[in-house]
């Protein structure tokens, strides 16, 4: 792929982001180096790795809840990465034509840290944005999947116009460090809880029925989003070791109007992802690695995807 083709690809990605129903799948790679990957943790077995990972996620997320923020350099880099990414998503939604596609982006993440929530909270202090984490309630908030299908509009002070407010929907199938089981429901709290609702990354085989039901309900919600016409899914930081999510993506690709772009961290990742998925590329399913996007990318991260999407102009929405 020559330089001209690479620039054309970037333009195409920007165009899809503003003209299609926008979806993201964000995996644990996006929170590195603040939170290590499972394979980076020195331990005797997966059980010990899961335990050490959970402690690190709880510690890091606890720091994100403090005011003022006091973060290490690694934590600060990751937080600002998420903050910039979500700010660009908001800008894309503001440019989108709500008569063609909803001003909504779905963020589906297997991470159970609070980087996204903290970044969203920071953005909402200055910008108009609806954040939908699926919760219902005020003082006591419970997760309910029926809450995901909401759009919010601003009708003007004199009811003289209706303007859809941009919204970001967060779907967390692996749970979160601020989720607590309460009377067979999931309560979302503003603190790190003692026994959080978390699906361990090594799989669902040993999980209790309550967690298993939550996981598959969240998958169902996301599957419905990907089945919608004129949709695009960008995947970053995710290696498809979760077979359930991999199966969901392969099924979703059967929707001919869905475009899936998976971004690999390194040039070797394409073969790894395809092997994990037991799948092949096709017209609406592409895996992009650093060499596909430009010589300036030694690796490809969430911040690099942010940079590509942030270059959008109205010119990008026009047909070539």
Outline where the language-model segments fall.
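A Trp-anchored, charged/polar loop motif used as the substrate-binding/catalytic surface
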Residues: 4-9, 83-93, 147-157, 210-223
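Extended, H/D-rich, highly charged conserved domains that either
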Residues: 18, 22, 98-200
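Short, solvent-exposed loop/turn segments at secondary-structure junctions
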Residues: 29-32, 112-115, 175-178, 239-241, ...
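Short, conserved loop/helix-junction motifs that constitute active-site signature segments
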Residues: 91-101, 162-165, 251-257
């Amino acid at each position: 792929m020559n330089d001209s083709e690479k620039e054309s690809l970037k333009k195409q990605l920007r165009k899809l982001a503003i003209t299609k129903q926008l979806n993201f799948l964000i995996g644990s790679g996006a929170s590195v180096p603040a939170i290590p990957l499972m394979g980076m943790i020195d331990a005797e077995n997966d059980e010990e790795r899961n335990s050490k990972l959970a402690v690190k996620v709880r510690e890091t997320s606890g720091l994100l809840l403090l005011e003022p923020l006091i973060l290490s350099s690694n934590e600060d880099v990751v937080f600002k990465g998420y903050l910039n990414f979500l700010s660009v998503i908001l800008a894309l939604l503001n440019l989108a034509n709500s008569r063609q596609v909803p001003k909504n982006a779905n963020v589906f993440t297997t991470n159970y840290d609070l980087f996204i929530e903290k970044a969203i909270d920071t953005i909402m202090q200055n910008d108009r944005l609806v954040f939908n984490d699926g919760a219902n309630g005020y003082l006591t908030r419970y997760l309910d999947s029926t809450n995901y299908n909401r759009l919010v509009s601003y009708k003007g002070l004199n009811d003289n116009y209706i303007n859809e407010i941009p919204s970001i929907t967060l779907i967390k199938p692996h749970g979160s460090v601020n989720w607590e089981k309460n009377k067979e429901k999931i309560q979302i709290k503003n603190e790190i809880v003692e026994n959080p609702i978390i699906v361990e990354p090594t799989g669902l085989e040993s999980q209790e029925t309550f967690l298993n039901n939550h996981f598959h309900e969240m998958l169902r919600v996301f599957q419905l989003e990907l089945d919608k016409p004129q949709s695009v899914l960008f995947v970053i930081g995710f290696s498809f070791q979760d077979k359930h999510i991999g199966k969901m993506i392969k099924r979703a690709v059967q929707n001919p109007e869905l475009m899936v772009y998976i971004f690999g961290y390194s040039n070797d990742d394409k073969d790894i992802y395809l092997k994990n998925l037991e799948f092949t590329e096709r017209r609406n399913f592409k895996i992009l690695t650093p060499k596909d996007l430009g010589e300036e990318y030694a690796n490809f991260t969430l911040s690099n995807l942010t940079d590509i999407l942030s270059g959008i102009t109205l010119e990008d929405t026009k047909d070539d």
